[in-house]
Amino acid sequence: MNSNLSNITAETKEVGQKIESTFGHLSAAQINWKPGADGWSIGQCFEHLIKTNELFYAELDNISKGERKNSLLENYSPLSSFFGNLMINSLKKDARKFKAPTPKIVPPSEIDANIIELFAAHQTEIIEKIKQTENADWQKTVITSPFMKLMTYRLADGYRIVVEHEQRHLRQAERVLQAENFPKE
């Protein structure tokens, strides 16, 4: 197993375990409580991650089967490393807010109370999909963002973006949990 693969899968697994241990005991009311009209609930944070990550599945499946070729843009974009690093660094800054780029990944207001279990299953699934791309060259395989069609980044950066995005929303959910008016039961 290459070191990138083991690092990414370990970090992804760690996020899933932390989410299960921190939020797995919460009630439906707690999962769906919002800190304000514009704020997301804990459940919405994790529903959003599932929806977002699933947008990469078709690409990952094609990469793992060896059926995917870089597009012309992906082959010749001089900015792939720049965009990858930009996204990674932006996701690390919690103060910077992003608006979801497409309604497809905006979670509904009411989230199923078993979202933590669903997220745990999702983490297992995405880790398996990442492992299946082990034989691809993560530095030479360039993918296009499912949200901004002119933004490309290396597969290695794509995986780092997934991890940073998950960690960002984990921190957001922790802030909701620590909010002054968060329901105790």
Language model feature labels by segment:
Residues M1-Q17:
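Extreme N-terminal tail/first-helix region
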Residues F82-D137:
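Acidic/histidine-rich alpha-helical segments that form the ligand environment
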Residues E11, T22, E59, I63, ...:
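Residues that form generic nucleotide/phosphate-binding pockets
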Residues W33-S90, T124, K131-Q132, A136-E185:
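Short, contiguous alpha-helical
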